[in-house]
Amino acid sequence: MTAYVIQSLQNTNLCIGVTSTAAGSLVTLQVLSGVGGTTSQWNMDPNTGYITLAANPSLCLDVQGYDGQQGQVIVASMTLGRTSQLWNWVGRAPNISNVQYPQMVLDNANNNASPGNPILVWPYNGGQNQKWSCLAVPALKAMLEAA
């Protein structure tokens, strides 16, 4: 499966990553260096809707603590049938929405484009902090080598 980097369109020097490769780790903005590292590469399966951590494919993006307004995005052990772990990005670019909470999209919290800032699900508002580009690692690597 092809790995992807989920790049912020608010600041293209940043991407989505995790603080560690363990279940329960927070999803945050990270500095995009080269093709990303083990904590910032993702497998994206449009057939299932799972976005799994390339370094540990048993972990996927999930929503924790959803209160009707927002929820923290973490990586959690993949659980079949858990719709908070399913995402829709096909035909929705540049937004990535949650299947269980379809009005909610990945959002860079408080519009703060700084490394370490948390990623939440938040109601769609069209802001730059909700726009992402999914870059295939092989294509990104070729682009960097050609530069």
What role is predicted for each listed range?
Residues 1-147:
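Lectin-like carbohydrate-binding module/patch detector with strong preference for beta-trefoil
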